[in-house]
Amino acid sequence: MKFLLLSTFIFLYSSLALARDKHYFIGITEAVWDYASGTEEKKLISVDTEQSNFYLQNGPDRIGRKYKKALYFEYTDGTFSKTIDKPAWLGFLGPVIKAEVEDKVYVHLKNLASRIYTFHAHGVTYTKEYEGAVYPDNTTDFQRADDKVLPGQQYVYVLHANEPSPGEGDSNCVTRIYHSHVDAPKDIASGLIGPLILCKKGSLYKEKEKNIDQEFVLMFSVVDENLSWYLEDNIKTFCSEPEKVDKDNEDFQESNRMYSINGYTFGSLPGLSMCAADRVKWYLFGMGNEVDVHSAFFHGQALTSRNYQTDIINLFPATLIDAYMVAQNPGVWMLSCQNLNHLKAGLQAFFQVRDCNKPSPEDNIQDRHVRHYYIAAEEVIWNYAPSGTDIFTGENLTALESDSRVFFEQGATRIGGSYKKMAYREYTDGSFTNRKQRGPDEEHLGILGPVIWAEVGDTIKVTFHNKGQHPLSIQPMGVSFTAENEGTYYGPPGRSSQQAASHVAPKETFTYEWTVPKEMGPTYADPVCLSKMYYSGVDPTKDIFTGLIGPMKICKKGSLLADGRQKDVDKEFYLFPTVFDENESLLLDDNIRMFTTAPDQVDKEDEDFQESNKMHSMNGFMYGNQPGLNMCLGESIVWYLFSAGNEADVHGIYFSGNTYLSKGERRDTANLFPHKSLTLLMNPDTKGTFDVECLTTDHYTGGMKQKYTVNQCQRQFEDFTVYLGERTYYVAAVEVEWDYSPSRAWEKELHHLQEQNVSNVFLDKEEFFIGSKYKKVVYRQFTDSSFREQVKRRAEDEHLGILGPPIHANVGDKVKVVFKNMATRPYSIHAHGVKTESSTVVPTLPGEVRTYTWQIPERSGAGREDSACIPWAYYSTVDRVKDLYSGLIGPLIVCRKSYVKVFSPKKKMEFFLLFLVFDENESWYLDDNIKTYSEHPEKVNKDNEEFLESNKMHAINGKMFGNLQGLTMHVKDEVNWYVMGMGNEIDLHTVHFHGHSFQYKHRGVYSSDVFDLFPGTYQTLEMFPQTPGTWLLHCHVTDHVHAGMATTYTVLPVEQETKSG
């Protein structure tokens, strides 16, 4: 250990001789925080007083808006007697810590609170004794002192700002964070979190970034006060009858979740003010739990982030991102989270753009076009599946035992598959008498409004006529407008009159005028056209779910034909995947009256009734009923994707049979979140009928899946790829007993170090739970076609865990997988990204052997700006959901031709990580597992919520709580981490590496120590380990941390050649 430390010190001090020393004196203090200090009347979006009172009003069993918290404060010096004022907008966040590359930062921490806390920094380099995180890491004595700073004690943390943060493609200064890490989720919920800004060498002048006028740091978080260490104190202090409080009551718990920005909720965040034409830098991060799916929307502004144009920034727990904006359009604007549940719960703030007579950037565009649209909102009867059939199974949608029955069955208290909705429809002129007929190319649009398109420099005029029964509007994204033309109504105190633009009454008409200045258009890195959307913003939640949404595309100057189609593109498709929540529709009561046979018996609060109205659709179509997704072999296709909704709307839209290019990367699955939009470029090279579907398991079974067809048309299309290399793998599906947690030692030591005594619902058997062992089926490699001898996994493969064998291929190869089904039910093997002869994956019956052939053309390999090797997943598709959760998944790695020989004389270390909550309730073997492993199988109720929860195994490669072994490397190794995400709505995983940053490529090289994973995300992360030690690797989502989605990786000093393991 002494040798290990000595080598670490020599390395750090030799490389940092030129460092600048910076000192911060930070105290942890307990204080009462008010989440909504400004109580003046504001007009917020989708919020009524009843909703705000639910969170802000205290009472007999309600805490209200004030909570005792522990917060980081900055002091002038080591006496800790005088605090330094911070900007009002920082809220309860700790002080901003700033460093340039090569700086050395000393954080003098004093704990003035009543319990142990620490200081753990993201994105910087530190040795083990400055990590500030509690977990079993084989350290002793002085290396443990950083793990717990007791009340009244002090500790100095020494941090080094090193390459690779920020990365070459990053902005000059990037967002990082620091927080306490005894029990990180509880410490953060108690208030201990702050921003750390890391900058490239020479980019700061007097502690401000050069060429930036204003900077702001924003944390979007649903702060869960139920997890705070001070919950008991807060109940005693702020509830008028504390003895009546039931801490397990769902309403009580929800009232303590504060939907806030920097600790301010319901529009009370102060101090966001700037001049028009100011160059503004936003440092943004998310924090929290599965509910923390945020879409930060800067109304009226254009931002660039990672060189792409945007007005929405998606944030998840520990997502770290920055954005640049030139403030425009003087006025008071809304900064909101467009997750519709968060909008209703008060996650909104105002920012002011003042007119300070600063010269604004010149817009020197000649010959402006005015594009005029005539759009009405009108009622329609909408059928989510006009054929009455599940196109995937051929069955009637109401067939017994079918997944679709719950949504399409009509009856006494069920609406069925048809709903009265509102839709935007286009007319020829302002008389609104002749509706424009949709052509065959527009058939796929479905419920969506007409496409509004424009080029940079254009003016858009939309004459909107409301034929409905409620006030409605049109709120665009991706264009510039004045406050008088905004379709969302909100306002600071004192602005009370309803504006015409944001409140078009029934039978009224309003003409909107929007412009497309240069900064709203695509950047050099963007595609030719940007996918955007428009929707009704009177009450976005109700209006969007009623059907009022449509696509927009904003394109580079001169890129469109007269009819709006993009030059050099054969076909354009618009896809809007969302869970239409008809319970939130403006017309719910009409639908109950019209379509149920006993409307007076309907209980709108009944969970089953609500579930039956959640329509998992694309453009308003379910189970393959979307028409018009037809194209020709070899055509140039653009897909414009966009979404809206809430935290359930985490989508992985998978195009089987083909890949696309987006942001320089080659992919086949696009991740979408509320209000996010994407442009995908595809050249289909295989004819047949393929699936476009959401990989999020509940969405897939719920009907969010369609078919697209690639035809051989007149145009001759030849695939000239010559597949020279041939690789054969012998893989079998084998049933095994799988133990998610063979040793409880790491978990027990963790809880001992945290001084917590916690039971474990996932691993403890108790009376009738299954425990940690389950029968599963896994892919395993064999030596030859006799399938007699399984390939023994080497030390470097130990970390694979449940994963099948890594299948490696280069572009131009043909991979033959000889697959034997040694299990007891039919399975198959199907890979993402590859080309196959047929669009059908044939199941292999028990005992059978079948050969699956995968071709690896150019479009299966890395894009121009990708890493040289990129991961895809392979899995069984007989029943996508049950096969996956039963255990069948593995990695496929595709490298550029001859990459290894040319680029890398030194072999890279490779590690494969699958972050997945294995839902054992969905496994084929659930009944077997109850029989075999439950102490009292006869007592098991498979619908019991606690039983269901106990079978959700939060695992990395199928292992929990430090049980994933074999992640061992040396200083100076080059390491590729191939990370994969699959699963359901809860499978948003923010993967955090302690001790090291990594690099990844998105049209440029970026650096971070947290990467966001979703169902269908496959990504290469490159790491160059430099600090020896055993380091934590975990998901940063609160529930996932507590449920055991964590392990460690070990970096050995360069001289110490020992066996890994």
Curated annotation (Swiss-Prot):
Reactions accelerated catalytically: 4 Fe(2+) + O2 + 4 H(+) = 4 Fe(3+) + 2 H2O; 4 Cu(+) + O2 + 4 H(+) = 4 Cu(2+) + 2 H2O; a hydroperoxide + 2 glutathione = an alcohol + glutathione disulfide + H2O; 4 nitric oxide + O2 + 2 H2O = 4 nitrite + 4 H(+)
Positions of the catalytic residues: 694
Subunit comment: Found in a complex with MPO and LTF; interacts directly with MPO and LTF, which allows Fe(3+) incorporation into LTF, activation of CP ferroxidase activity and protection of CP antioxidant properties by MPO.
S-S pairs: 173-199, 275-356, 529-555, 632-713, 869-895
Chain positions recorded as Na(+) 2 binding sites: 407, 416, 419, 612
Sequence positions that bind Ca(2+): 128, 143, 146-147
Enzyme class: oxidoreductase
Domain Plastocyanin-like positions: 20-199, 208-356, 369-555, 565-713, 725-895, 903-1057
Superkingdom, natural source: Eukaryota
Signal peptide: 1-19
Protein name per UniProt: Ceruloplasmin
Residues the record lists as binding Cu(2+) 5: 651, 694, 699, 704
The keyword Secreted appears for this protein: yes
Residues that coordinate or bind O2: 120, 179, 992, 994, 1036
Cellular component GO terms held in the UniProt record: extracellular space
Residues that coordinate or bind Na(+) 1: 55, 64, 67, 255
GO BP field: CAMKK-AMPK signaling cascade; fatty acid oxidation; gene expression; glucose homeostasis; inflammatory response; intracellular copper ion homeostasis; intracellular iron ion homeostasis; lipid catabolic process
One Pfam family linked to the record: Cu-oxidase_3
Expression sites by tissue: Expressed in many tissues, including liver, eye and brain.
